From Swiss-Prot:
Protein's name according to its UniProt entry: Biogenesis of lysosome-related organelles complex 1 subunit 1
Domain of life of the native organism: Eukaryota
Organism name: Caenorhabditis elegans
Alphabetical keyword list: Cytoplasm, Mitochondrion
Assembly mode: Component of the biogenesis of lysosome-related organelles complex-1 (BLOC-1) composed at least of blos-1, blos-2, blos-4, dsbn-1, glo-2, mutd-1 and snpn-1. Interacts with glo-2.
Function: Component of the biogenesis of lysosome-related organelles complex-1 (BLOC-1), a complex involved in gut granule biogenesis. May negatively regulate aerobic respiration through mitochondrial protein lysine-acetylation.
Record-stated family: Belongs to the BLOC1S1 family.
Subcellular location: Mitochondrion intermembrane space; Mitochondrion matrix; Cytoplasm, Cytosol
InterPro entries linked: BLOC1S1 (IPR009395)
Any Gene Ontology CC annotation: BLOC complex
Amino acid sequence: MLKEHSKKQHLRREVQEKLKNEAIVAAQTLSTAVVDHLNAKVAQAYGNQKRLDVEAKRFENNSAALAKQTEQWLFITEGLNYALKEIGDVENWSKTIENDMKIITETLRRAYEAKNPPLPPNQANPASH
């Protein structure tokens, strides 16, 4: 009976040791699976962050290019405004000159008429008599 009891205890210990080893293997398998899953998520997050960094850099470059283009447009617009102002100034100057020439022409015509009065109608053409 003692031998039988010792044998049963020994078998029970072997079964418990086997179950313990299986539990350890299962725990290691589970922890490996969890770590692999987490590593996959971390790798995905890292990849997403890299893509975001690339997009942010591209956005920054595009923004700088847009700012430069806008400055060029402003410079061109200012030049156009200045040219249009000069054209307006030339137009006003030419109208002033034209008006002055009309005044001079009218003054000369009146001076000529004052110095050379028109002939009476019957003396205008002596050959018609």
